[in-house]
Amino acid sequence: FSGDNIFNHNKQRLSYAGAFVYFPGAFYGVGYNAGAEGYAQELTTTMGIFRISYCTALAGRFYIGVSGGIDYTGAKYKDTGMVAYMNNVKADVDAGKPVPGGRMGELYTLWQEGRYDPAKQDPFSNYITESGDNPNAFNTSLGLFAQYDTRDVTFNASRGIFIKAEAKWYPEWLGNTRRNFGRFTLTFDFYRKLWKGAIFAYDLYADFTAGTPSWHMYAKMGGMERMRGYYEGRYRDKRLVETQIELRQKIYRRHGVVAWIGGGQVWGTDKFRWDNTLYSFGCGYRFEFKNRMNIRLDYGLGVYANQNLPWDRKRSSAFLFTASEAF
């Protein structure tokens, strides 16, 4: 659920959102290198979130406000036991038995060639062991933010600017699973009409963490809004910057199309390097089911992943279907 309440001729705003979901997921590790290597451990995740914020206008379209949030993520997982399995296969092969067929045989051959590491097959188990983090993590935040908003429509703008800077604090005394950590996010969106039915949209987003967050609270790349085409959280770290441009064109009555291109970086665990920049591009279809409210179908593409791993040789891609624009 989510909602926005506007009071006193748009001088005060109250926003809230929440969700509770149970879904299968995957964890690749923390840092660019972990995401690029492509070793993923399957998780069964229970997630509950609640967000609330209130802001008041200081002058014109400039607002300041306070925010709060609750995040819970619990993960169930099993080790694959690939290290022991590969060692057993090696012992059998050394004793004169044939290499197994199928996927396991291919992985054994890759291991012998130095292109597969069974010790990295369980990145979530490895992370929990090495970091001491809790797989069932609870986090509560308090925040302050400032924003400037001249958009004509908040959920599907055709002109205007939106800027928001927010600092959140996750104190241990509020029950956080990890010790104190902080988070700063910056959003800059720009919209402009071009020709008949065409809108140019630009988005810049930055997410920086101070301290060590819980495993599910790192800045995550991908998903429904930014860097579309990537599995959300495959690339995660303490610092993230993403940017994208999108052209939106209405073609006939309620029907429209879009195309976008974007790029992003995660770093902190690994050093910032320009050649670690990831890109995203794609196109989509829009159907305006109500005035200025669209159903969105997007197809996003990203980089090719680890060509050594059988499950990771295709280009990163995703179909996305939801209501409202990406930004």
Residue ranges and their predicted role:
Residues 252, 264-268, 290-292, 302-306:
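Short Gly/Pro-enriched loop/turn and capping motifs at secondary-structure junctions
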Residues 227-231, 272, 276, 310:
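Outer-membrane beta-barrel domain signature, especially the mid-to-C-terminal portions
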Residues 16-34, 66-72, 82, 161-171, ...:
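Transmembrane beta-barrel strands of outer-membrane/channel proteins
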Residues 1-5, 50-56, 66-70, 144-148, ...:
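Residues on the lipid-exposed face of transmembrane beta-strands in outer-membrane beta-barrel proteins
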Residues 1-138, 221, 234-237, 294-295, ...:
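Gram-negative/organellar outer-membrane beta-barrel architecture
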Residues 275-276, 280, 288:
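C-terminal soluble interaction/assembly domains
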Residues 10-14, 60-64, 153-155, 195-200, ...:
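Repeated loop/turn-to-beta-strand initiation elements of outer-membrane beta-barrel proteins
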Residues 126, 132, 139-147, 151-252, ...:
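C-terminal outer-membrane beta-barrel translocator/porin domains of Gram-negative envelope proteins
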